């Protein structure tokens, strides 16, 4: 009897460790955005899109990033980067409990992930623009299932700036 209880507890502990790791984006994904699934990307047409509104903002403004698909997805990993390069810069903030900001090696909350066993066909993320002049895009990896994922899906370009002066500036 003790052996059976010990075996059940060992299996439960093993399952708990696997479940606690679920929902985490591995740090290796930050560089190439590839999920650690060991499979090739699908050759089927991309069923997902990223739209942004508005596409021209000033620092402090909010951009709605809308992720949608003709098929449901179980995960998305989103990074904000320069429009002319793959450079990563700070990104999105949380909207739902299953959403989480991700810390990449070069910064804090500069990527976003959603991972769930409950599939979605849309997800909205509000992003607050920094006080800078730049052109950026969002790049995403979509995971439909363990063996089906698409990498490098890009949003339309967003123009940031020009820099605004403070509204409450003191006149000299």
Swiss-Prot record:
Xref: InterPro entries: Ferric-chelate_Red/DefProt (IPR051237), Reeler_dom (IPR002861), Reeler_sf (IPR042307)
Keyword vocabulary terms for this entry: Antibiotic, Antimicrobial, Immunity, Innate immunity, Secreted, Signal
PROSITE patterns: REELIN (PS51019)
Any single Pfam family the record assigns to this protein: Reeler
Official protein name in the record: Putative defense protein
Domain Reelin residues, every copy: 22-172
Entry GO terms, CC: extracellular region; membrane
Induction notes from the record: Its synthesis is positively regulated by juvenile hormone.
Domain of life: Eukaryota
Signal peptide range: 1-21
Compartmental location: Secreted
Functional summary from the UniProt entry: May have antimicrobial activity.
Predominant location category: secreted
Family: Belongs to the insect defense protein family.
GO BP terms: defense response to bacterium; defense response to protozoan; innate immune response
Summary of the tissues where the protein is detected: In adults, in hemolymph.
CDD domains on file: Reeler
């Amino acid at each position: 009897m003790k052996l059976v209880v010990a075996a059940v507890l060992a299996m439960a502990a093993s399952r708990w460790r696997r479940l606690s790791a679920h929902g985490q984006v591995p740090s290796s994904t930050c560089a190439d955005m590839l999920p650690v699934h060991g499979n090739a990307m699908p050759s089927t047409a991309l069923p997902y899109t990223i739209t942004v509104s508005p596409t021209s903002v000033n620092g402090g403004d909010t951009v709605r990033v809308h992720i949608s698909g003709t098929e449901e997805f179980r995960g998305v990993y989103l990074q904000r980067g320069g429009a002319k390069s793959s450079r990563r810069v700070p990104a999105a903030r949380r909207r739902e409990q299953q959403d989480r900001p991700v810390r990449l090696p070069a910064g804090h909350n500069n990527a976003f992930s959603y991972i769930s066993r409950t599939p979605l066909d849309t997800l909205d993320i509000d992003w607050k623009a920094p006080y800078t002049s730049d052109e950026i895009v969002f790049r995403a990896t979509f995971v439909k299932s363990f063996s089906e994922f698409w990498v490098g899906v890009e949003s339309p370009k967003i123009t940031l700036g020009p820099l605004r002066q403070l509204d409450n500036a003191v006149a000299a």
